[in-house]
């Protein structure tokens, strides 16, 4: 009996020791877990502080980059601007390519006109100086001078004669087509030869107005308005165009 009791006591002591050992091991694990948690939190805080300091020392420029969509709005805007500018440059270069030849052709044409007038002034006497002192416009060998001031038909005719020229006389289809570009409005010579009859029939509208016998005498002068011939009162004042021809 005494030996049995001793064995029981030994067993109880061993169990107590095992329980105490397990308890102390569990407490150590808890302490270690808490220590690890504290260490992890500390490391996170340290990283945050380091990142904050780095951001303050090296501020990043805003680029407008959208991480969610993976696109850069600024880049898209610049691409659109680049396309617009490129298209505008192409259009501008194309226009310049068309304009430069026209400018050169106009300059050459004007140079030929001036050389014709210069040669005319040098070869002739002082009576041709009036032709050289005005800005005449040339179509082939025909030169024209447009006046916006108004005169009667007789005054217009006399003014052109003073410039050693004559009142506008349209005698060909080519001449008419050139003059229609300028939308001439004023007194003209109105001949009844075959050429003028053909022009009036095919290319020019004649404004017909009924006059009595007394009015016909005063309305025997004609003027051109756009592409229309009209009979007008010779005493009324209108614009006019002078013309001369180099044969």
From Swiss-Prot:
Coiled coil: none annotated. Residues 1-39 are annotated as: Disordered. Residues 1-79 are cytoplasmic. The keyword Membrane applies. One of its GO terms (molecular function) is carbohydrate binding. SUPFAM superfamilies: C-type lectin-like. The keyword NADP does not apply. One of its GO terms (cellular component) is plasma membrane. Residues 139-243 form the C-type lectin domain. Gene3D superfamilies: Mannose-Binding Protein A, subunit A. Its main location: membrane. Glycans are attached at residues 125, 196, 212, 218. Expressed in natural killer (NK) cells. Residues 101-247 are extracellular. The chain crosses the membrane at residues 80-100. Disulfide bonds join 160-242, 221-234. It is found in: Cell membrane. InterPro entries: C-type_lectin-like, C-type_lectin-like/link_sf, CTDL_fold, NKG2/CD94_NK_receptors. Keywords: Cell membrane, Disulfide bond, Glycoprotein, Lectin, Membrane, Receptor, Signal-anchor, Transmembrane, Transmembrane helix. Residues 1-12 have a biased composition (Basic and acidic residues). It is a single-pass type II membrane protein. Heterodimer with KLRE1. This is Killer cell lectin-like receptor subfamily I member 2. It comes from Rattus norvegicus.
């Amino acid at each position: 009996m005494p030996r049995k009791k001793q064995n029981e006591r030994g067993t109880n002591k061993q169990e107590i020791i095992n329980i105490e050992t397990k308890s102390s091991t569990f407490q150590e694990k808890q302490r270690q877990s808490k220590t690890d948690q504290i260490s992890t939190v500390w490391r996170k805080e340290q990283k945050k502080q380091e990142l904050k300091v780095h951001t303050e020392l090296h501020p990043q420029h805003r680029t407008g980059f959208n991480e969610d969509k993976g696109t850069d709005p600024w880049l898209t805007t610049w691409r659109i601007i680049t396309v617009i500018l490129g298209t505008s440059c192409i259009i501008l270069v194309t226009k310049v390519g068309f304009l430069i030849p026209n400018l050169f052709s106009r300059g050459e044409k004007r140079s030929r006109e001036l050389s014709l007038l210069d040669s005319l002034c040098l070869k002739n006497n002082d009576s041709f100086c009036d032709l050289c002192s005005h800005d005449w416009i040339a179509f082939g060998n025909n030169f024209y001078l447009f006046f916006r001031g108004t005169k009667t038909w007789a005054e217009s005719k006399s003014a052109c004669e003073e410039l050693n020229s004559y009142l506008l006389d349209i005698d060909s289809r080519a001449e008419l087509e050139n003059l229609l570009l300028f939308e001439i409005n004023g007194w003209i010579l109105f001949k009844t030869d075959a050429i003028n009859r053909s022009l009036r029939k095919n290319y020019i509208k004649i404004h017909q107005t009924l006059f009595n016998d007394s009015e016909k005498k005063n309305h025997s002068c004609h003027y051109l308005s756009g592409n229309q011939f009209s009979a007008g009162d010779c005493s009324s004042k209108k614009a006019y165009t002078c013309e001369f021809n180099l044969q």
